[in-house]
UniProtKB/Swiss-Prot annotation:
Can form a complex with MtmB. GO terms for molecular function: cobalamin binding; cobalt ion binding; methionine synthase activity; monomethylamine methyltransferase activity. This is Monomethylamine corrinoid protein 1. GO terms for cellular component: cytosol. Keywords: Cobalt, Metal-binding, Methanogenesis, Repeat. It comes from the Archaea. Residues 93-217 form the B12-binding domain. Belongs to the methylamine corrinoid protein family. The keyword Repeat applies.
Length: 217
């Protein structure tokens, strides 16, 4: 089976909420010699992007998102050990504090980005979902003086708006200059990042890892 055919099957498994079949497809792909990173970036993440777009367009709703998320989680259980094997050694890229915005419990992209950052040499502090901005600021303050990257995600426009409040709080607490700030999620755009004074965004988890490394140079 050609790699593109494998990637298409992985994409469709996520879009069609194939909870049981997705991890099996991942095992088959690994057995065929496809790298775990490619399975994620060229197959699963493509499916998640489609799911996110459909959700934004109100073509699917929360139950479908959750089922696609479960399929993704099951896939990552198979792939995370493979990513760990290939983890980049050497100097730590920095500390990534990852979280999902207050009012948002959609953690699919968040978990994927967190895994990818860990695989690319970042130490991880995962604050989880529905995180208050004051908790993010508090965590950032604990690590003042270190190389810190805040990585927040929001699937909904309403929760995305809290990212501006977070930037304001970081400025008020005089922490903004000591951290880099990166936000992602379906509604987040380059224009929004510029408007709130953050540092970066990314289209998907693999790109997020690359952008994060660039931002932390």
């Amino acid at each position: 089976m050609a790699n593109q055919e494998i990637f298409d099957k992985l994409r469709d498994a996520i879009v069609n909420q194939n909870v049981a079949g997705t991890p099996e497809l991942c095992k088959e792909a690994l057995a065929a010699g496809v790298p775990a990173l490619d399975i994620i970036t060229k197959g699963l993440s493509v499916g998640m992007k489609i799911v996110g777009d459909k959700f934004e367009a109100a073509e699917i709703f929360l139950p479908q998102i959750m089922m696609s998320g479960k399929a993704m989680s099951n896939a990552m259980e198979v792939l995370t050990p493979e990513l760990e094997k290939n983890k980049k050694e050497g100097e730590e890229a920095g500390l990534a504090i990852t979280f999902v915005a207050e009012g948002d419990i959609h953690d699919i992209g968040h978990r994927l980005v967190t895994t990818m950052l860990g695989a690319n040499g970042f130490q991880i502090v995962d604050l989880g979902v529905d995180v208050l901005n004051e908790n993010v600021v508090e965590e950032a303050a604990k690590h003042k003086g270190e190389k810190v990257l805040l990585v927040g995600s929001a699937l909904m426009t309403t929760s995305m708006l809290g990212q501006k409040d977070l930037m304001d709080r970081l400025n008020e607490e005089k922490l903004r200059d000591s951290v880099k700030c990166m936000f992602g999620g379906a509604p987040v755009s380059d224009k929004w990042i510029e408007e709130i004074g953050a540092d970066a965004t990314a289209e998907n988890a693999a790109e997020a890892a690359k952008v994060a490394l660039e931002v932390m140079k």
